[in-house]
From Swiss-Prot:
One of its GO terms (biological process) is reactive oxygen species metabolic process. Residues 48-58 have a biased composition (Basic and acidic residues). The modification N6-succinyllysine is found at residue 103. Residues 60-106 form a coiled coil. Residues 26-58 are annotated as: Disordered. Keywords: Coiled coil, Mitochondrion, Phosphoprotein, Transit peptide. Forms an alpha-helical dimer with monomers associated via an antiparallel alpha-helical coiled coil composed of residues 74-106, leaving each N-terminal inhibitory region (residues 26-52) accessible for interaction with an F1 catalytic domain. The inhibitory N-terminal region (residues 26-52) binds the alpha(ADP-bound)-beta(ADP-bound) (ATP5F1A-ATP5F1B) interface of F1-ATPase, and also contact the central gamma subunit (ATP5F1C). It comes from Mus musculus (Mouse). Belongs to the ATPase inhibitor family. Homodimer; represents the active form and is present at a pH value below 6.5. Homotetramer; represents the inactive form and is present at a pH value above 7.0. This is ATPase inhibitor, mitochondrial. Residues 26-52 are annotated as: N-terminal inhibitory region.
Length: 106
């Protein structure tokens, strides 16, 4: 009984305290973000347009990088599978030769 009580207290006491501590320090930031204060993009104008253009350029560049990485991955896969096909074809030929040798010997 004493052992299980210690285990329960250790499990819930320590973890419960950490949960309470982390919950106590967290602020609800959704209230402060609703005002949009300081957001250049929401203000509109030249700065908002410039920021949108920079974001668009960034995402186009990231998409281009991802497509290049995907293209390289597929090329590597094709190369790997081509080599695997060649290896398997050589095995098939080797087995066919063994079968032919067995037929010739008997």
């Amino acid at each position: 009984m004493a052992g299980s009580a210690l285990a329960v207290r250790a499990r819930f006491g320590v973890w419960g305290m950490k949960v309470l501590q982390t919950r106590g320090f967290v602020s609800d930031s959704s209230d402060s973000m609703d005002t949009g204060a300081g957001s250049i993009r929401e203000a509109g104008g030249a700065f908002g347009k410039r920021e949108k253009a920079e974001e668009d350029r960034y995402f186009r560049e990231k998409t281009k990088e991802q497509l290049a990485a995907l293209r390289k991955h597929h090329e590597d896969e094709i190369d790997h599978h081509s080599k695997e096909i060649e290896r398997l074809q050589k095995q098939i030929e080797r087995h066919k030769k063994k079968i032919q040798q067995l037929k010739n010997n008997h």
